[in-house]
A protein has these predicted regions:
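Sec-dependent bacterial lipoprotein signal peptides
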Residues: 1-10
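Bacterial lipoprotein signal-peptidase II cleavage site
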Residues: 10-32
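N-terminal low-complexity, Pro/Thr/Ser-rich intrinsically disordered segments
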Residues: 25-69
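Short, hydrophobic/aromatic-rich segments at coil-to-beta transitions
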Residues: 50-57, 86-91, 145-155
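Secretory pathway targeting signatures of secreted, lumenal, and periplasmic proteins
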Residues: 61-118
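Stable alpha-helical elements in mature extracytoplasmic
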Residues: 67, 117-124, 194-201
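Surface-exposed amphipathic alpha-helical segments
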Residues: 71, 178-210
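Signature of long, low-cysteine stretches enriched in small and polar/charged residues
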Residues: 123-173
Length: 210
């Protein structure tokens, strides 16, 4: 995958009002300016292991989103049905800069065969039950509106961890017989559900319609 623009730090000589570089004194004054232009990531050629740093505009085929500065992402999986472009899935791991442990997992999939928001929630809980150890408990909370989407919230607790899920579902057109399930999973050990980053991320997330 090709990243169009990378973050960079560059040094330049201080410029006077006449446009000439100021060389007064033995050591020129140095300004360090951060280029905050966002990376642009497209779905073309996306594959497992691809990664990038925020700020980034990410086009992951089925969804688009903006990752703010101070965070990075890694593609865990990406696939697209060659016969039906509406079918496929993408999973992204999200990290804080300098951390080796992901704070969130974002998944968009059209392979679960769910046909409603209610089924999307049931599917998420079912997968949690399969993956949890003993004494797992799932609680459905209040719906939350972020950006263009309304998310069902699920809190999962076990003897070993606590997680929160934000789940939404969309039909993307008359030819879409599967629907798209979008799920953000966060581990409470690394980040909380009310962290401003979660709102910023979900506010930016858009589902690509057919």
């Amino acid at each position: 995958m090709i990243f169009a623009v990378s973050l960079s730090l560059f040094a330049c000589g201080k410029v006077d009002g006449d446009g000439k570089e100021n060389t007064t004194g033995n050591t020129p004054t140095v300004d360090k300016t951060e280029d905050t232009t966002a990376e642009v990531t497209t779905a073309a050629g996306m594959k497992k292991g691809d990664e990038g740093n925020g700020p980034a505009d990410i086009n992951a085929e089925f969804i688009t989103l903006k990752l703010p500065s101070g965070y990075k992402y890694e593609v865990d999986s990406f696939s697209k049905d060659s016969k039906n472009p509406l079918k496929g899935n993408v999973t992204l791991f999200i990290y804080k800069d300098g951390s080796y442990s992901s704070i969130a997992t974002l998944t968009a999939t059209a392979r679960n065969m769910v046909r409603s928001q209610e089924e999307a929630v049931e599917n998420t809980i079912k997968l949690c039950n399969l993956q949890t150890y003993k004494n797992g408990k799932s609680e459905i909370g209040k719906d939350a509106k972020y950006g263009e989407n309304t998310y069902s919230t699920i809190h999962v607790s076990t003897d070993y961890y606590e997680k929160d899920f934000f789940v939404t579902y969309a039909n993307r057109g008359t030819s879409d017989t599967t629907g798209l399930l979008v799920k953000l999973e966060i581990n409470n050990k690394n980040i909380k559900a009310d962290d401003p980053f979660i709102k910023e991320l979900l506010d930016s997330l858009k589902i690509v319609m057919a």
